[in-house]
Every structure is written in C-alpha cells, then in structure tokens.
C-alpha cells in the first residue's frame, strides 16, 4: 500500500486482480476502498446472465450463492488493491460462510451494492474474515460473514514452481 493506492477499481483493474471471467466475474466496479479495511462493490444485474435461464424461468431471481460470491469478489479486490496484487496471479478461496440471511429478491435491472468490511486480517495474512451486506436501492438483500484464504502463488497457474 502506498500513498498512490487507488480508492476505486474499474473492470480492467478488477480483471488484473481476480482470475474470474464471464460468466463468473460478478463485480463490475469497486469504490470507496479503504485499504485493508472496507470497500463497496457494484454489480449491475442483467437478464443476460446465464443463471436466469433456470433460476427461475419466467421469474428471474439471482441465486443467493452468487450474491455471496459477489461480496467475496469485492473483498478480494479490496485486499488485492490494498496489497498491490494486480498481475500477480492472486487467488482467493472460501473457507466458510456464516450467518447468511437473504432479505430481498434480486433480479434483472437491479444494481447490487456490495459492502464488505474486514473483521480479521492484516497485510500479509493468509486468512481473512469479512462482514458483507448486499443492498439494492438502500434495501438489504443479503448479509453474512465469510472467511477466505488469500493465496499468492510463486508462479503462474499451470507452470511448475
């Protein structure tokens, strides 16, 4: 982290940090990054997303697990920006999801605001814990706590280390 650490991440920076790509890249922008502490991700929900074909035909509802994944991706971007991990083959793995509650349906046309706050973890730590809240127009859609392991490989995936 430096004085030049960005407080936002556009889709280009997000893709330099996260390995996820369509159809599993679930955050479009991250703003209000407070290094190693918190951030707000934005996910523009569109009818073109593949999960809406089967969840549910005629009544498209974003699966709750994808909302939680979007919060986790927001947290990973916050840590990645804070630790200057763009282009460094940064991987993150779920370790646990706790106290998850869904409060509102999310569907096409909604903009998810993904508020994440680190409750455990510090620069260089492998295990982090976060509190997350997903909102649409200020209304709570989902809340949970989750634990993730941050992994910075010494060589790119698929290459011998």
Curated annotation (Swiss-Prot):
Q: Which EC number(s) does UniProt give?
A: 4.2.1.59
Q: Which UniProt keywords apply?
A: Cytoplasm, Lipid A biosynthesis, Lipid biosynthesis, Lipid metabolism, Lyase
Gene Ontology molecular-function annotations: (3R)-hydroxyacyl-[acyl-carrier-protein] dehydratase activity
Which CDD domains would you find in this protein's record?
FabZ
Location (main, coarse): cytoplasm
Where found, per UniProt? Answer: Cytoplasm
Q: Name one GO biological process term.
A: fatty acid biosynthetic process
Q: Which InterPro entries match?
A: FabA_FabZ, FabZ, HotDog_dom_sf
Role this protein plays: Involved in unsaturated fatty acids biosynthesis. Catalyzes the dehydration of short chain beta-hydroxyacyl-ACPs and long chain saturated and unsaturated beta-hydroxyacyl-ACPs.
Q: Indicate what this protein is called per its UniProt record.
A: 3-hydroxyacyl-[acyl-carrier-protein] dehydratase FabZ
Gene field: fabZ
């Amino acid at each position: 982290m430096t004085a030049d650490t960005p407080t936002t991440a556009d889709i280009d920076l997000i893709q330099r940090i996260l390995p996820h790509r369509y159809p599993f890249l679930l955050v479009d922008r991250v703003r209000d990054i407070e290094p190693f502490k918190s951030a707000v991700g934005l996910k523009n929900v569109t009818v073109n997303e593949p999960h809406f074909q089967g969840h549910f035909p005629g009544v498209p509802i974003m699966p709750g697990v994808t909302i939680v994944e979007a919060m986790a991706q927001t947290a990973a971007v916050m840590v990645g920006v804070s630790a200057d991990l763009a282009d460094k083959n940064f991987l993150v793995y779920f370790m646990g999801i706790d106290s998850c509650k869904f409060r509102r349906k999310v569907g096409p046309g909604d903009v998810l605001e993904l508020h994440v706050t680190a409750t455990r973890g510090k620069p260089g730590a492998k295990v982090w814990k976060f509190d997350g809240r997903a909102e649409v127009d200020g209304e709570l859609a989902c809340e949970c706590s989750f634990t993730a392991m941050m992994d910075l490989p010494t060589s790119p995936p698929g290459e011998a280390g």
